[in-house]
Amino acid sequence: MALKQRINDEMKAALLGGDRFVGDTLRNLRGAILDEEVATNKREQGLSDEEVEKVIAREVKKRHESVRLYRENGREDLAGPEEKEIEILSVYLPEQMTESEIEKLVAAKITELGASSPQSMGQVIGAVKSQAGNSADGALIAKIVKEQLNK
């Protein structure tokens, strides 16, 4: 079953089952997916599962940032619901790579590409992202590539 269809089905089930929080969270996600479809002119054919995963990852990242800001400002009452939304949305993301797995992949790509200076950072990041897909955070990849190229 396509990821977008699974999200729609689970949203309906949550709303019919009386779990309003989950239903509303998935409804907001569905809106973000629709926005992406419109922005990329893919309203007719829809987004691929990989593109939907990117939208979900972006939504999770927004919520992580919100939690951080709420905690910095002492608003635990607002951070809690955001964390629940992160848990709900994370179910639809692929298993995330650990930092050590990313480090191994980066080291392999640096060797494969023969990169030796920070000028090749973009090339290495692109190669790692293309292999890792949505299972690795782009910021973490960039940080690790930068560290390894500056050794």
PLM region spans:
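Charged, compositionally biased, marginally structured helical/coil segments
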Residues: 1-151
